[in-house]
């Protein structure tokens, strides 16, 4: 016995166990809140009928249910089956079962239990039960111990040895051969059928053996005349630490040769008389029944009574209580039980230590689990398996692999459970493929690679690491269950070989294997990235037919598939079909709207989400920030930022970066920079967002300064970083700086320049007036120039008046994109600026000949959360007269300040006065006039234009900002322009 004075990790309070009753008072199966059915009046009547075995009361209750319940709940019907079974009416139980519209595993377990409990265990009934079990295997993929228990009982009644062996094999296949109840029943069957050798093997493999099983083995040895084996077993029983009951004492007396006197062996009772042994057995039996029926409040009360009554607990008590702590998710209870075990010295027992490891792992306290494991004086394979599995399942893969290597060094032979756990851990690591292959070699060495669990785990490991050839070799060698099929399909999907996923799915159904939620979710994901909407619709129909469309995981997969395929109508239907969408489903719908260009709808969905009381997560916030960026809706973006602050997720790198990008793209670069400085965990994406934002706003020097700061902090730039840096050089006319960073990109960081980087450099040359150098750069590139590069160069030719180079560039641009309207427009603008009206008309004629229409230019402004759109000479606004009057006032005021209309931007050959008038009512001027009328003085006016701002409007904006003392932020197709005090942030480089 361990000294009670030893320091223990937790303080022990018996009262805490009693306190655990309060939060769990309604968690038992009989409590009102345990299900919707149990709160009804019918459940109480059924319980009374079962308790009193009153068939008449049960029938009357059934009749009332049929009268008053149009669609009785499945839980209630299951209890009807149990009632008829307990009251001895198998016929009525079967009738209720046959009429059930849909059945779950509990329904099947109930009817099988009815056959097993029937006093009429005739051959016909046994055969009917076996037939039901075969049907069950077709309808339900997974079964439980509650399914096997009645089947094993029927095997015992029937005397069918072959059936018992078949169920034993099935138990091994589904991993229940180690279950104490299933294994115990199998031991009992083998012993009753005289197969003592088989019973002994199974008995010795069991992780926990109660006194009843020991009694069965002792009795079998005695009845078969194996007295030496019985003596050895009695010694082993003494070493186990279990307390014998009265039956044990009689059997031990028979071994000693005196059936009438058990005094010679009473020392096995450890100083307790038979009555005290019977008391603890009775108490443990009650605890076990409460545990398996889910009546945790009653169990805790029973245990508290044991403690207060000074009933000495044994290892079985502690194993049951530790299992209870896991069931009710109570670390406090688990620690108190651990404390009691320490005080009584029972934590030294192997089975108790193993249960402690299991409890701490299930409650995610891996440090405690490892401490228990490290302090064990004796460990068996179950100890190793428990700690490896617990650690592997909760993200500590490296530690799990190290423990596996330590196990091998100890000379222990891993079993299928060890191998599956370590394979799961190894395959998740960066070096997962190499480790998985080493484990595979060891599995071959110890000859357990043929085990279905190990083979399936190997398939999963290879699939995770996209080594599908190795997975295929394993898969083709055996007839696998659904788990292996799922692993293969998931592997193909992860390897971007979706066509094989769909082929395997079709083959699986052809061979009669039924899908589960994981299968369907994988297939929908595959259909999404393949844009295979027709196949997706077929699988959707199958999901509806099989009832999986109501599964949240599957329904989210259906929604995501339609979103990725661009069918938002079908996506909306799928979303509306989800009974209670979670945050993932809402976010999928929101991001789908954004991906398909329906940003305003995304905000509408978000409003519905908040009305439903669903809190957005970090991904939702980041997605909505992106929507604000696309709409350049600053006010909505600010609201999203406010939501992020309320949810305390602004420190999330993903959210912070998205908000920085949103403010930058909405024209509020100061807000973007303030938020950027407050991000605590800054990654390269955040730096890139800020660099690109500054570049778009023409803050070239600030961009380069920030880039220098980033490098000083040891953050390595990537290709996106250099796009921002080169863009800043381009917009600020820093040609030499652009060349310098282009060389540094490849020489210092090993980043090969791509088309986007060359585009920025060519743009920098064009804006600086070095049009021919830009043309030479494009011609000298090793890669083919893009249409956007030629488009940028053509715009530069228009600004510089280089019609000769512009003509060559336009020819190459039209070869790449003959239907690009901007090419014709830029060409005609270039000729108009040079007063070459005949060439301009020819360009327009070419445009008409190719039936190309010019993209209409328009500008918009957001006022009071409403978007107002304007086109040239627009008179659709209800305030048109006021707006046009304001434009006239603006032109008058800025002319007095020195503004001179740049009539070169007029594309018609008319009188100068007409040219001026044509410039006055460009869309951006109308939008600014509306902004002056509709926004408070001194507040910034933010205007967005879909095309590049014309030179005259750009010049006019500088004067308007100065005369009216307003900051004007104008975002065109190329960049941001911030007009303040008569100066633009672009420095006239645009």
Curated annotation (Swiss-Prot):
* Any one of the GO BP annotations: RNA modification
**Residue ranges of the region described as Type E(+) motif:** 865-895
Please give the name of this protein: Pentatricopeptide repeat-containing protein At4g33170
Where are the PPR-type repeats located?
73-107, 109-139, 144-178, 179-209, 210-244, 279-313, 314-348, 349-379, 380-414, 415-450, 451-477, 481-515, 516-550, 551-581, 582-616, 617-651, 652-682, 683-717, 718-753, 754-788
Q: Where is this region: Type DYW motif?
A: 896-990
Q: Which organism is it from?
A: Arabidopsis thaliana
Gene that codes for this? Answer: PCMP-H53
Give an example GO molecular function. RNA binding
Sorted keywords for this record are: Repeat
Q: Which family does it belong to?
A: Belongs to the PPR family. PCMP-H subfamily.
Checking InterPro entries in the record gives:
DYW_dom, E_motif, Pentatricopeptide_rpt, PPR_At4g14850-like_plant, TPR-like_helical_dom_sf
Ranges for region Type E motif: 789-864
> Which Gene3D superfamilies does UniProt cross-reference here?
Tetratricopeptide repeat domain
């Amino acid at each position: 016995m361990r000294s009670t004075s030893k320091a223990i990790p937790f303080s022990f309070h018996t009262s805490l166990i009693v306190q655990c009753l309060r939060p769990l008072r309604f968690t038992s199966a009989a409590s009102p809140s345990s299900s919707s059915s149990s709160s009804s009046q019918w459940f109480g009547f059924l319980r009374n009928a079962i308790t009193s075995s009153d068939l008449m009361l049960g029938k009357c209750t059934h009749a009332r249910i049929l009268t008053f319940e149009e669609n009785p709940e499945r839980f209630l019907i299951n209890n009807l089956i149990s009632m008829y079974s307990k009251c001895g009416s198998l016929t009525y139980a079967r009738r209720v079962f046959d009429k059930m519209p849909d059945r779950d595993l509990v329904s099947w377990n109930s009817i099988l239990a009815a056959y097993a409990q029937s006093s009429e265990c005739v051959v016909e009934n046994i055969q009917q039960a076996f037939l039901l079990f075969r049907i069950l295997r077709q309808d339900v993929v997974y079964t439980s111990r509650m399914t096997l228990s009645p089947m094993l009982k029927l095997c015992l009644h029937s005397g069918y040895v072959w059936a018992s062996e078949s169920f034993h094999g099935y138990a091994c296949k589904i991993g229940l051969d180690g279950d104490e109840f299933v294994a115990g029943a199998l031991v009992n069957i083998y012993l009753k059928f005289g197969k003592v050798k088989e019973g002994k093997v199974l008995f010795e493999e069991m992780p926990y053996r109660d006194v009843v099983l020991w009694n069965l083995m002792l009795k079998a040895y005695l009845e078969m005349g194996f007295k030496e084996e019985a003596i050895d077993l009695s010694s082993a029983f003494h070493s186990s630490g279990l307390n014998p009951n009265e039956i044990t004492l009689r059997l031990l007396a028979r071994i000693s040769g005196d059936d009438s006197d058990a005094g010679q062996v009473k020392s096995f009772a450890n100083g307790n008389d038979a009555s005290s042994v019977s008391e603890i057995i009775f108490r443990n039996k009650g605890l076990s029944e409460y545990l398996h029926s889910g009546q945790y409040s009653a169990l805790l009360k029973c245990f508290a009574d044991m403690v207060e009554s000074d009933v000495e607990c044994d290892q079985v008590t502690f194993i049951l209580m530790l299992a209870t702590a896991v069931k009710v998710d109570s670390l406090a209870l688990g620690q108190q039980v651990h404390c009691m075990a320490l005080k009584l010295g029972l934590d030294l027992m192997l089975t108790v230590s193993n249960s402690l490891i299991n409890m701490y792992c299930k409650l995610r306290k891996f440090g405690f689990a490892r401490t228990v494991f490290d302090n064990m004086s004796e460990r068996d394979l179950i100890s190793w398996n428990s700690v490896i599995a617990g650690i592997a399942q909760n993200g500590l893969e490296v530690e799990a692999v190290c423990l596996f290597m330590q196990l091998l060094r100890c000379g222990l032979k891993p079993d299928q459970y060890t191998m599956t756990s370590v394979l799961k851990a190894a395959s998740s690591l960066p070096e997962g493929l190499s480790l998985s292959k080493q484990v595979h070699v060891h599995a071959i060495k110890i000859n357990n690679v043929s085990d279905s669990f190990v083979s399936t785990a190997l398939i999963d490991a290879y699939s995770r690491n996209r080594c599908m050839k190795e997975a295929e070799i394993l898969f083709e060698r055996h007839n696998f269950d659904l788990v292996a099929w799922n692993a293969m399909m998931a592997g193909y999907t992860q390897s971007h070989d979706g066509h094989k996923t769909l082929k395997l799915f079709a083959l699986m159904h052809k061979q009669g294997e039924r899908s589960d939620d994981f299968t369907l979710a994988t297939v929908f994901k595959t259909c999404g990235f393949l844009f295979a909407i027709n196949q997706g619709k077929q699988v959707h129909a199958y999901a509806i037919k099989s009832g999986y469309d109501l599964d949240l995981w599957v329904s989210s997969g259906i929604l995501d598939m339609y979103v990725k395929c661009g069918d938002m109508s079908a996506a909306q239907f799928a979303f509306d079909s989800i009974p209670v969408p979670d945050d993932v489903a809402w976010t999928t719908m929101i991001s789908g709207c954004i991906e398909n260009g329906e940003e305003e709808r995304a905000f509408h969905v978000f409003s519905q989400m908040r009305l439903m009381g669903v809190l957005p997560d970090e991904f939702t916030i980041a997605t909505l920030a992106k929507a604000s960026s696309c709409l350049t809706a600053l006010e909505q973006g600010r609201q999203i930022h406010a939501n992020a602050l309320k949810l305390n997720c602004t420190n999330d790198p993903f959210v912070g970066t998205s908000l920085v990008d949103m403010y930058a793209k909405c024209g509020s670069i100061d807000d973007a920079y303030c938020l950027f400085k407050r991000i605590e965990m800054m990654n390269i994406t955040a730096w890139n967002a800020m660099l690109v934002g500054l570049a778009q706003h023409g803050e070239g020097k600030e961009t380069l300064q920030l880039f220098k700061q980033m490098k000083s902090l040891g953050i390595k730039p990537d290709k996106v970083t250099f796009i921002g840096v080169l863009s800043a050089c381009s917009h600020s006319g820093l040609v030499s700086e652009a060349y310098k960073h282009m060389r540094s990109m490849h020489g210092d960081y090993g980043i090969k320049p791509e088309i986007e980087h060359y585009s920025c450099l060519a743009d920098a040359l064009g804006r600086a007036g070095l049009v021919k150098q830009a043309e030479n750069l494009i011609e000298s590139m090793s890669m083919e120039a893009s249409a956007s590069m030629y488009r940028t160069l053509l715009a530069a030719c228009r600004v510089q008046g280089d019609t000769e180079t512009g003509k060559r560039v336009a020819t190459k641009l039209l070869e790449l994109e003959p239907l690009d309207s901007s090419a014709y427009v830029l060409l005609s603008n270039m000729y108009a600026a040079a007063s070459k009206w005949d060439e301009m008309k020819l360009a327009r004629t070419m445009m008409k000949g190719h039936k190309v229409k010019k993209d209409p230019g328009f500008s918009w402004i957001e006022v009071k959360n409403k978007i107002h759109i304007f086109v040239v000479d627009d008179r659709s606004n209800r305030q048109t007269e006021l707006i046009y009057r304001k434009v006239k006032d603006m032109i008058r005021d800025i002319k007095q300040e020195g503004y001179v209309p740049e009539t070169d931007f007029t594309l018609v050959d008319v009188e100068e006065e007409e040219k001026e008038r044509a410039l006055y009512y460009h869309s951006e001027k109308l939008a600014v006039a509306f902004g002056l009328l509709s926004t408070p003085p001194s507040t910034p006016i933010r205007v967005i234009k879909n095309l590049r701002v014309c030179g005259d409007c750009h010049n006019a904006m500088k004067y308007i900002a100065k005369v009216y003392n307003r900051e004007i932020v104008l975002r065109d197709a190329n960049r941001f322009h911030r007009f303040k005090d008569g100066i633009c942030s672009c420095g006239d480089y645009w």
